[in-house]
Amino acid sequence: MERNHRYATLVIDARTKLPLYLHRGNAAKDFEPFFTIYSKEFYKAIKAFAMDQNTSYSGVVGRRLPQCTIVCDYFHIMKNYSEQVTDAVRRRTGRLFMRLGRKDDAFRIRNAARLLNKRFPVRITDESDWSARLMLDVMMKKNHDLDVCIHMRERLQDLYDSCRDAAAMAKGWGLWCRMAKESGVPELVRFAEKKRLRQQEIVNHALFPISSGTIEGCMNRIKVLKRVSFGLRDYDYFFLRIWQAFLPEGTYRTLSDKVWDDHMCTACAKEDAA
């Protein structure tokens, strides 16, 4: 549509994977209309919301749906860990090696971003995975901070995968945070301190193992539509194309007048989308 970033708020049903709400902007006021377009029974049936760490969104949900459980998205937690811990330690280690004159080690670790964030299967059968794992083991033995970061990431992933009880999740998360603070790795300590503030939302993943991964997958389809629509200045028509893109094959969906009145849509948006 335009250059630079323009954000929108998207709500998707985790079961049907169909969009429920789409609005231009990512502020709290852009999320508020979602709670006025469906019936009271619909909102009472909502048990949990999975979202990123946008405090404005969580504040709106807490105020509008006090009975709803907010789940801090696993995808964004691990993404933050990769960016704020693993990549930060990798860059710091690369700069240290350059100052020490170890240029080969510096270049090797600078080019290992994908390798350091890769999650290997429990049983490795692929030869390329074997060689990559051996290379990772060598780098971990040469650098203590990287070794700690990789092991702590694996413990965090195992915690998300294995815990389906809130008490066990809370205990495991508290233990993980203590280990992170005692590690002595500055990036890991800062990460643990920040995420400790969202402990309850992280623990809620044990009660409702959902994430915004569905939305992240939908974003790939929306990005394709955005490239096709580059130069088009009608956001209402662009949003209509997004609604249409997620229709199941062989079905029809009537767009609610009330939904599109919120977007100030033109008459074309009030027709049936096929």
Where are these regions (language model features)?
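Short alpha-helix plus adjacent loop in nuclease-associated cores
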Residues: 77-98
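Acidic/histidine-rich catalytic cores and adjacent linkers
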Residues: 2-5, 9, 13-17, 24, ...
